[in-house]
A protein has these predicted regions:
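Tubulin/FtsZ superfamily GTPase core signature
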Residues: 1-388
Length: 388
């Protein structure tokens, strides 16, 4: 099995990535943490040599206080460093919690770097709890739709609010975050091992990208494990899966447009085991649903079997994200080579093309003439590149 890299971004991403160190199969992973907050990196539990401190000359090890633009600028300062570190990676899994400064701000930078390296990348992201407020939800949504979907191959977003369906009303918020971290770590491990192992049932990166299709989707993830010698293990695995904290119950399977089922186990894992588990799970899945399966065996799993299911529900209000070429104005395409954020080393991270970024005009009454918001700088509204 080839090694792959897992990059935890921001405090949540680093915490989740650190939990992978204790799981079976961790020896096949290169685990890294990326943040501008030195204390958060230190507290993540990742070894110091696997910590990437962003924008240290500017931030001096301090966090960006939830400010996305500052997080983006700090991350952009590490472009060359990231390119060097990721140059030999075979596949990258990026883990982050969206909604705040560095986790959201760094996404466009990472996407730019990995695209230039032609590095297959899966973004595994969580969106904020409802009690974190609408501002963080808007930030997360903006990051997904503007920074990732137009260019990223595989974007998996899981709402933390799914936890609220399985936790009692008196649950402590720290407990909720800890549980979300643990389940996301288990899911990231299963996804990584399946995409990079010598699978007994094939499921690769290109297939996952085709499944997601750069469309806006809400995902849920279920996780379950049993001893390989347990009686009726196929039935028990599926029952445990449906009770998983961020699965959302059997209704998520029934309503899904696409489902990715992953079974991992020790060397004794057989095709018969995989068939029995998948057939039991399919009882809860709509016949019209597109299903992708993967099964892999690794000695590090011993006598344990792990079953992970990713459900995908596409946003019916949107459509497939237009290609970068199609999204540019005609004037921006005619007579010259197309420029995208991938062609710029630093500029896009300072001048975001998101129309809602009003800078100092945020919160003031807009000046709108003929349907055009004149508070937004002309070069942003018209996608005019600014010379470096």
């Amino acid at each position: 099995m080839k090694k792959l890299t897992v990059l935890g971004v921001g405090s949540a991403g680093c915490r989740i990535t650190a939990k992978l160190r204790e799981m079976p199969g961790a020896g096949n992973l290169h685990l890294l943490g990326f943040d501008c907050d030195a204390e958060a990196l230190k507290n993540s539990g990742l070894p110091e040599e696997d910590q990437i401190l962003a924008g240290v000359k500017w931030r001096q090890g301090h966090g960006c206080g939830g400010r996305v633009n500052e997080g983006k600028t700090a991350a952009a300062a590490e472009r060359e460093n990231l390119s060097r570190i990721l140059a030999d990676a075979g596949l990258l899994v990026v883990i982050a919690g969206l909604g705040r400064g560095f986790g959201s701000g760094a996404m466009s930078v990472i996407q730019s770097v990995t695209s230039k390296l032609q590095l297959p990348t899966v973004f595994l992201l969580t969106t904020p709890f409802i009690f974190e407020g609408p501002s963080r939800s808007r930030t997360a949504e903006q990051t997904i739709t503007a920074d990732l979907l137009p260019l990223a191959g595989a974007v998996v977003t899981v709402p933390n609010d799914l936890l609220l369906c399985s936790l009692g009303p008196d649950v402590d918020h720290e407990e909720a975050f800890a549980l979300a971290d643990r389940v996301m770590a288990q899911s990231a491990m299963a996804l990584a091992l399946t995409l990079c192992s010598g699978n007994r049932l094939a499921a690769d990166y290109d297939t996952l990208c085709a499944l997601l299709g750069r469309r806006h989707a809400v995902c849920s993830i279920g996780h379950a494990s049993v001893a390989a010698d347990e009686s009726e293990k196929e039935r028990v695995l599926v029952e445990k899966l449906l009770d998983s904290p961020i699965m959302g119950g059997s209704s998520k399977l029934k309503q899904a447009d696409a489902v990715f089922m992953i079974l991992n186990g020790g060397e004794a894992l057989s095709l018969g085991d995989a068939r029995a588990v998948f057939e039991n799970a399919r009882k809860y899945i709509s016949p019209e649903c597109e299903v992708l399966i993967g099964a892999g065996a690794d000695p590090s799993w011993g006598k344990e079997m792990q079953f992970v299911v990713l459900t995908v529900k596409f946003d019916r209000n949107g459509s497939e994200t237009a290609s970068t070429e199609e999204s540019l104005p005609a004037a921006g395409r005619k007579g010259r080579k197309r420029r995208s954020s991938l062609d710029d080393e630093f500029q896009p991270d300072l001048f975001s093309s998101q129309t809602s970024d009003l800078g100092v005009m945020e919160g003031t009454p807009p000046v709108i003439i003929d349907g055009v918001n004149l508070d937004i700088p002309t070069f942003i509204r018209k996608n005019i590149p600014v010379g470096r």
